A protein has these predicted regions:
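Non-catalytic terminal/accessory segments
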Residues: 1-266
Length: 266
């Protein structure tokens, strides 16, 4: 519905702005960003055009969401923060998005005090994987490391809360293991497969998600035109290859047999 209502807004903006104004329009559903050469262009040209366009459709600009900011101060869009650092444009996860995932993890761990470690992992892993996948195209490694540490703290507290006295030491031996000499204290638990064999499942680490820079689609490319068939087939193949590589990495690192975990005795 939002696509239908806002259809034509970009054309209307460019119709009334000069090429030298350097006006660009980016939209997803009912969220959009307009950039320009100066703040005056946005105030005196763009905002009046947008306001009039929306008014004709019985809508109005949200005063809460509408603001003019310099690119060096940055802005948030769809959970991303876009900002210029020392002359270089970088896109990172927004602070609000980071706070949101931390809250979700904290609440999930709190709900899971009565669960087994394997059950907690099965609920947390899709949350962790989904968030990390969403931000794998941007500058996210430092954020991934910060959140991995946050998840460790919450699962450590879960273990301490679940067990008391001397049993805490045994719980630490059970729930925190090592993948290698360089990757220790990974929250994990065992499950039994259909053959009754123990298989250890580990909490996913965001740092294991490979950063894959987005390759922009050619602006002139149209998937409905036959001359671009090969181009979109290549993009589709590249996407599948990236997904397969990530799947293999997940399988290797997050579902591990006993002998691959240091210090585990079957």
């Amino acid at each position: 519905m939002a696509n239908m209502v806002l259809d034509g807004l970009e054309k209307e903006i460019h119709k009334h702005c000069k090429l030298s104004d350097k006006v660009n329009y980016i939209r997803y559903a009912d969220d959009f960003v307009v950039t320009a050469n100066t703040p005056e262009i946005l105030k005196e040209k763009v905002i009046p055009i947008v306001s009039k366009f929306l008014a004709q459709r019985g809508l109005s600009l949200s005063q809460e969401k509408t603001k003019i900011t310099h690119i060096e101060d940055g802005f948030d869009f769809l959970g991303f923060n876009v900002r210029k650092y020392n002359g270089k444009f970088l896109t990172k996860p927004s602070k609000d998005s980071i706070k949101s995932i931390q809250t979700k993890i904290k609440e999930t761990v709190r709900k899971g005090y009565g669960w087994s470690g394997a059950d907690l992992i099965s609920v947390l892993n899709p949350i962790i994987q989904g968030w990390a996948n969403y931000y794998r195209k941007v500058v996210s490694k430092a954020t991934y490391a910060k959140l991995d540490n946050y998840i460790y703290q919450k699962t450590f507290y879960w273990t301490m809360r679940k067990f008391h006295g001397n049993t805490r030491y045994k719980a630490m031996d059970r729930y925190f293991r090592s993948r290698s000499h360089f990757r220790r204290w990974i929250f994990s638990d065992f499950v039994k497969d259909k053959d009754g064999q123990k298989r250890y499942v580990c909490i996913k680490k965001m740092m294991d998600v490979k950063i894959q820079r987005h390759i922009k689609v050619r602006s002139s490319a149209n998937p409905y035109l036959p001359e671009y068939k090969d181009y979109f087939e290549e993009r589709k193949k590249w996407t599948k290859d990236c997904s397969y590589i990530q799947w293999k990495l997940d399988k290797k690192l997050n579902v591990i047999m006993d002998e691959n975990l240091l210090g585990v005795k079957p």
